[in-house]
Amino acid sequence: MALDSAKKAEIVAKFARKEGDTGSPEVQIALLTARIAELTEHLKVFKKDFSSRLGLLKLVGQRKRLLKYLKNKDYTTYSKLIVELGIRDK
């Protein structure tokens, strides 16, 4: 369920703070959101794929931790990011 390199590069270019930035929380959250969306579509077709379901829950937890970190560090960037990605705010 990995993203292809073209889609990954597009996401990195869109959310990067500067050229070559792949480690900022915004980029990581955007990449996780794309992977979560792909896994969600996969699980709609293959309802009994429990190992993928566990992987999805792990990714959601990781994204949740990164969102919490970004919310505490830089709230304006956090609020822009959740609007752009369509993620609900708690």
Curated annotation (Swiss-Prot):
PROSITE patterns in UniProt: RIBOSOMAL_S15
Keywords: Ribonucleoprotein, Ribosomal protein, RNA-binding, rRNA-binding
GO biological process, one term: translation
UniProt GO molecular function: rRNA binding; structural constituent of ribosome
Record GO cellular component, one term: cytosolic small ribosomal subunit
Protein's UniProt keywords contain Cell membrane: no
Family according to the record: Belongs to the universal ribosomal protein uS15 family.
Quaternary structure annotation from Swiss-Prot or TrEMBL: Part of the 30S ribosomal subunit. Forms a bridge to the 50S subunit in the 70S ribosome, contacting the 23S rRNA.
NCBIfam families found in the cross-reference section: S15_bact (TIGR00952)
Chain's role: One of the primary rRNA binding proteins, it binds directly to 16S rRNA where it helps nucleate assembly of the platform of the 30S subunit by binding and bridging several RNA helices of the 16S rRNA.
Protein name: Small ribosomal subunit protein uS15
